[in-house]
Amino acid sequence: MRVAALISGGKDSCYNMMQCIAEGHQIVALANLRPDENQVESDELDSYMYQTVGHHAIDLYAEAMALPLYRRAIRGRSLETGRVYTQCEGDEVEDLYELLKLVKEKEEIEGVSVGAILSDYQRGRVENVCKRLNLQPLAYLWQRNQEDLLREMIASNIKAIIIKVAALGLDPDKHLGKTLVEMEPYLLELSKKYGVHVCGEGGEYETFTLDCPLFKKKIVVDSSEAVMHSADAFAPVAYLRLSRLHLEEKVSSVPADDETANSIHSS
């Protein structure tokens, strides 16, 4: 099946792409929703649906995979917040509809890779959009044990760093920029102590993938800046702004030919 992958830059969307390929599907394009830069100043958008921290690096992520990237600004807001989503003009879900509609027209996709693990809210809305577009959602991580998933992601050579923290026990000064390998023991400890979701499904943390087996090149962070979003005494919310990055060749990578060269489509 020809598949477009919904990506945030994080570990979950990356690992779900790997599962799609393992099941015999072909990832032909990447799709991403970004903040409308004319309307918001912060990288962290108040969205029920989308991870936006790290959005500045998405173009490089697509270049690392040598796949076409389709992006759309999030112009809507969370208006229809009921358990079951019904089509609502001005809702942020309709931005996803317009984005995937464009990708389907351009790339003739049949399915969509979705990295949802636990959120019925997100999954139901993606399914609503896919049904309207006659696309098959592929969510291989859905309701998997999070400790198992984190272990598998690390074992699968997904190199991801923490770019947002928002939970009791996570310290911006200590944990922003740390890798999954470095954080795994501590995340397991926080899970036992405070019930923190090991994969961050409760919004406790977010990640950005710098390398994985799907990348033709790896992403290197040259400089970054910690930004305090909410200085809560017990669970401060902070994120890492990736200000300068570059791609490096991987020792075992094969250069992409002209047919798979990266192209970017924005709306």
From Swiss-Prot:
Q: Which GO BP annotation is one of this protein's?
A: protein histidyl modification to diphthamide
The UniProt record lists the EC number as 6.3.1.14
- Residues modified as Phosphotyrosine are 97
Cross-referenced InterPro entries? Diphthami_syn_dom (IPR002761), DPH6/MJ0570 (IPR030662), Rossmann-like_a/b/a_fold (IPR014729)
Q: Name one Pfam family in it.
A: Diphthami_syn_2
Catalysis performed (reactions): diphthine-[translation elongation factor 2] + NH4(+) + ATP = diphthamide-[translation elongation factor 2] + AMP + diphosphate + H(+)
Task: Give the record's pathway.
Answer: Protein modification; peptidyl-diphthamide biosynthesis
Q: Which of the seven top EC classes does this enzyme belong to?
A: ligase
**Which GO terms of the molecular function aspect are on file?**
ATP binding; diphthine-ammonia ligase activity
* The protein's role, per its UniProt record: Amidase that catalyzes the last step of diphthamide biosynthesis using ammonium and ATP. Diphthamide biosynthesis consists in the conversion of an L-histidine residue in the translation elongation factor 2 (EEF2) to diphthamide.
Q: What is this protein called?
A: Diphthine--ammonia ligase
Q: Which organism is it from?
A: Mus musculus (Mouse)
| Gene it is expressed from | Dph6
